[in-house]
Amino acid sequence: LAMALILGAPAAEALNGLASFHGTGRRFELKATVHGIRVIDDYGHHPTEIDVTLTAAKRYAGDGRVLVIFQPHRYSRTQAFMNEFARALSIADEVVLLEIYAASEAPITGITSKTIAVQMEHGRFIPNFLEASDWVIDNAKPGDVIITLGAGDVNSLAPIISDGLARRFN
């Protein structure tokens, strides 16, 4: 608001614009709330972004837990930040790691999401999307926050998880 006013925008126009702004897509985007379980999607795919997102999620969850389905983006990034990913993801209470989203990169021998999961106390490697979704659906409790996290196609799981939670609790 202050910047809009400094740049000469009329105050009423700036306030109307601010009132209609609903945030940026795929950045801590609330996709659904089912039986007190919030399902969020976030584009975070670098350890620093993940740290910030999960720290905020822990506060947002209050007494609830944070359950994450993470899909690393690119083999080269996973190789470069493997330890940092494990540390940042460990902020969450439970983490399911999907296979790496290649984004046109060739696989790197020995680099998989499992190599991150084994560094974590509460990490598990479940490469299949539906099995990963089922694990989260089966383990979520009212008050928990579920986050689909990553720059690949992990966001496609948010509606699957929401529907699964609705079936489980209704």
Predicted regions and their residues:
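C-terminal helical cap/extension that packs against the catalytic core
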Residues: A86-P142
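Short glycine-rich anion-binding loops that position phosphate/pyrophosphate groups of nucleotides
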Residues: H45, P72-Y75, I100-A103, A151-V154
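Short amphipathic alpha-helical segments
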Residues: V52, A80-M82, I108-T109, I137, ...
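Generic structural signal for residues in well-ordered beta-strands
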Residues: V39-D42, G123, I146
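Nucleotide phosphate-binding/pyrophosphate-handling subdomain across enzymes
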Residues: L1-E94, V118
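A glycine-rich beta-strand to alpha-helix segment
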Residues: A132-G164
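Short, solvent-exposed amphipathic alpha-helical segments in soluble enzyme
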Residues: T55-R59, N83-R87, I111-S113, P142, ...
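Short, flexible loop segments at boundaries between secondary-structure elements
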Residues: L97-I100, G164-N170
